[in-house]
Amino acid sequence: MKRAYGFLVAVSLLSGPTVFAQDLSRYRDFVLESSVDTVAAASGVRATEAQTLHARPAKIQELQWRAPYVNPAITTADPVRDVAFTFFNDALYQVVVTYSRDRTEGLTNNDIIESLSASYGAPVPRSAIARTDLAADVLLENTVLAQWNNAASSITLLRDTYSPEFQLIVSSKPLTARARTAIREAIRLDALDAPRREAEQRKQDVADTEAARDKVRSTNKTAFRP
């Protein structure tokens, strides 16, 4: 119950403006550049649940929050289905919010944009949307509906290309740039290291097989009676 409470106490973006109006570095109680421990405490998720996606050259971690089941008949339930928090060296650089289809059913794109504008101000003109702030796979699978931008942060509202699902991405521009560079380098290093790791794994598999065979032999030899 603690996990649900920790997230639901925050004011819903779809139910009106927050006291942190037009602060693009914040989503509800979560502030960009916060630590894993800080985000975990605010969400009710244990910090130990954070997964390390890459350990070098920088530590990239992800912490997931998922909404508990709520009776669909409760119309005041939180519209958020899940949230993914991503960290660069223990600093929150991206928040990806996915809204429940049940809670956004019937809402138009403009309905969502108007609600977010109450918190973040007017979005930038469509011609000024910075698509480079978004990963290529995100742009491939989603339509950008609106964006809020300043020098340090960006907030982008997306809709799935193939389904009526809305997402909100809140990101730190400088940390996102550093994280992307680190992730590319991590992938490169992993590829270089793959042959060695595969050889070590094969060696370990052989050793494990031999150890298991020796254990069975020892057990059966002791118990065997002609």
What function would you assign to each model-found segment?
Residues 22-57, 99-226:
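Non-cytosolic coordination micro-motifs
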Residues 1-4:
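Positively charged n-region of N-terminal signal peptides that target proteins for export
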Residues 6-16:
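Bacterial N-terminal signal peptides
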Residues 60-107:
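Mid-chain, structured segments of secreted extracytoplasmic proteins
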Residues 6, 22-24, 84:
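Short, functionally important structural connectors and interaction interfaces within domains
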